[in-house]
A protein has these predicted regions:
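Low-complexity acidic/polar repeat-biased segments
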Residues: 1-2, 71-140
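Acidic, glycine-rich calcium-binding repeat modules characteristic of RTX/beta-roll
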Residues: 2-5, 10-68, 80-90, 141
Length: 141
């Protein structure tokens, strides 16, 4: 698996490459997840520095979600799998899109999990969250 390290500045990152780990390094980074991620791609996001945001753009279609104590796995409707490690280091922005100047509904990791039907993050293992949903406006539908 390849790793793409971004800068120490505030980067806008649009993950799309299969078999790639994206690292923002320093700075307040924004990761944009959309339906443009290739079918069956495997993507990992890790960023432990800065105030980082995962934006799930309007129309993103998600087949399943899985939550662990500090990670989330999103399986998109096209079979792509996006794993976010260190998820407590991120805010989650439903409907946001920095490239379009759009702000969505922002929550921390626990709030994002709750919005996906997980009332409490597990201390070990993982639990399933929402499935067969899409981002409509600033909410799951």
């Amino acid at each position: 698996m390849a790793t793409i390290n971004h800068s120490s500045g505030a980067d806008i990152i649009v993950p799309s490459n299969n078999g790639t780990t994206y690292r923002g390094l320093g700075g307040d980074d924004t990761y944009i997840l959309s339906n443009s991620i290739a079918a069956n791609a495997a993507i990992t996001i890790v960023d432990t520095s800065g105030a980082n945001t995962i934006q799930l753009v309007n129309g993103l279609s998600v087949a399943s979600t899985k939550f662990a104590a500090d990670a989330v796995q999103l399986t998109l409707s096209n079979g792509a799998v996006v794993t976010i490690n260190g998820a407590s280091n991120f805010d989650f922005d439903l409907g946001g899109n920095a490239t379009a100047g759009t702000s969505g509904s922002v929550s921390d990791f626990a709030g994002f999990a709750a919005g996906a039907g997980v009332s409490a993050l597990p201390s070990s293992g993982s639990v399933a969250g929402a499935s067969n949903v899409s981002v409509q406006g600033t909410a799951w539908s």
